[in-house]
Swiss-Prot record:
InterPro entries: Ferritin (IPR001519), Ferritin-like (IPR012347), Ferritin-like_diiron (IPR009040), Ferritin-like_SF (IPR009078), Ferritin_CS (IPR014034), Ferritin_DPS_dom (IPR008331). One of its GO terms (molecular function) is ferroxidase activity. Fe cation 2 binds at E60, E105, Q139. Belongs to the ferritin family. GO terms for biological process: intracellular iron ion homeostasis; iron ion transport. It catalyses: 4 Fe(2+) + O2 + 4 H(+) = 4 Fe(3+) + 2 H2O. Pfam families: Ferritin. PROSITE patterns: FERRITIN_1, FERRITIN_2, FERRITIN_LIKE. GO terms for cellular component: cytoplasm. This is Ferritin-2 heavy chain. It is an enzyme of class 1 (oxidoreductase). Residues 8-157 form the Ferritin-like diiron domain.
Amino acid sequence: MSSSRARQSFATECENAINKQINVELQAAYDYMAFFTYFDRDDVSFPKAAEFFRKASHEEREHAEKLAKYQNKRVGRVQYSDINGPTKTEFSSLEDAMNTALGMEKAVSKSLLELHEVASKNNDPALADFIESEFLHEQEDAIKQFADYLTETQRVGKGLGEYLFDKLTLNE
């Protein structure tokens, strides 16, 4: 592998932290794909929830791509790690799924904050700004949305309540 002439002021620790975050995002995408396939099953059949989680999976994959593109822009090298199987493939309810998703979003957010800390520690304002502008604000919105959905699914309960939540709330 040849060394790039364009690389400057990009610490190896930052490069490694970006690679870690790429894999965190890909794991989240994989996990959300499991949510999608569960709610798309004929014996579960929450089509709006399935579509909601399919979009969430796609969004996480886009985040990984955005980070990989940034890594290349900074002349770092993207290093992929193995992705584990989904953390959960069955859910007792929409409430269970929203609770699991909220936990995932908080974990992704924590990882992004750690990446931001590495950027700051290595005096890399460009990386810190990239993480803030492209990810952290969006992450706050996602956490709020999942927290709201968790509250709403707790309020409506199982059965008809879940059906109406799927039809009315996730149809937005």
